[in-house]
Amino acid sequence: MRKIKVAPFMPTEVEVNEISANRAEIVAYPFESGYAVTLAHPLRRLILGSSIGYAPISVKIEGAAHEFDNIRGMHEDVAVFIINLKNIRFKIKDGSDRVELKYSFSGYKEVTAQDLNNDQIEVVNGDLPLATLNEDAELNFTMVIAKGIGYVPSEDLRDEVAPDSIALDAFFTPVRKANYKIEPVLVEDNPNFEKITFDIETDAQIGPVEAFTNALEVMNKQLSVFNGVLDVDISTTLPKRTNDDNELKPFLAAVDALGLSARSFNSLDRAGIKFLGELVLMSENEIKNIKNLGKKSLDETNECLVEHGFGPEFELKENTRANLVKKLEQLKA
């Protein structure tokens, strides 16, 4: 049965699962029905569109008048060289908005992205090929790397680069992928709540969690325009997560998510037991005396406790017990 509400439910849980250095899943729940997509869609767009990255915006190649030219002794023509250059991902070490770099290579050499590393910039995908030179080749070029967001076509950059340089399409965004999925999640016995799972992958210029955090900051700053005029109250009473909250999390698993048989679950549900922690707080005799919990269901319940690390040898610390009792009272109020 639904209760009358005077405010939407505040989500309380956030989980960060780092799959690799460049990929992470960020999970948040529980949201009121419809709220998850309302928040997830604009956040995804901000992750993709507002994440700051670095890209080459121009290159000047000695001996090349335009991008369709050739350089003596270089296997690739200038157009292919430029494509290879645009695929390389950089970081400016001191965080500057722009840096100009000069390079010179000669003689037989397989030039790769890692050959561009120096005191000013770091290449994050150093194994990419750049150019193949023969024994009489000489490759001298100057490029400009800039900080930016999104994508800027070369036509829009021509006024910003030197007249004798070739303007490049600039792919600044460091985010390769930003997806989300929304799933139902049970809160007590109410299935009408939602969980958002963001799947974010970057190119290593920044990490996925940093990209997500930056998007949240941009969203907050964009919305703050209303606060000065409309006196919007953006404060929240949601408490910060404490060590106690983290310590109690294993105890707060819902009974209906423990994989018990229908008979065992129904017996516990009729007894008003909603959380694993309630069973942990009970003695062996108290569990045995749960109404309609037969021997088979009792054995299954005890096995479940053991599987979750709460077997007969488990001892609950007094302060943890007190915190758990208080938390369960709040959840079941």
Curated annotation (Swiss-Prot):
Biological process terms in GO annotation: DNA-templated transcription
Reported function: DNA-dependent RNA polymerase catalyzes the transcription of DNA into RNA using the four ribonucleoside triphosphates as substrates.
Enzyme Commission numbers on file: 2.7.7.6
Keyword Plastid among record annotations: no
Catalytic activity: RNA(n) + a ribonucleoside 5'-triphosphate = RNA(n+1) + diphosphate
UniProt keyword list: DNA-directed RNA polymerase, Nucleotidyltransferase, Transcription, Transferase
Domain of life: Bacteria
GO CC, alphabetical: cytoplasm; DNA-directed RNA polymerase complex
Gene3D superfamilies assigned: 5' to 3' exonuclease, C-terminal subdomain, DNA-directed RNA polymerase, insert domain, RNA polymerase, RBP11-like subunit
Family: Belongs to the RNA polymerase alpha chain family.
Single GO term (MF): DNA binding
Spans through the membrane: none
Chain residue ranges for the region called Alpha N-terminal domain (alpha-NTD): 1-227
Name used for this protein in its record: DNA-directed RNA polymerase subunit alpha
EC top class named in words: transferase
Subunit-structure text: Homodimer. The RNAP catalytic core consists of 2 alpha, 1 beta, 1 beta' and 1 omega subunit. When a sigma factor is associated with the core the holoenzyme is formed, which can initiate transcription.
Ranges where the record places region Alpha C-terminal domain (alpha-CTD): 247-333
Domain comment as written in the entry: The N-terminal domain is essential for RNAP assembly and basal transcription, whereas the C-terminal domain is involved in interaction with transcriptional regulators and with upstream promoter elements.
UniProt-listed InterPro entries: DNA-dir_RNA_pol_insert, DNA-dir_RNA_pol_RpoA/D/Rpb3, DNA-dir_RpoA, RBP11-like, RNAP_asu_C, RNApol_insert_sf
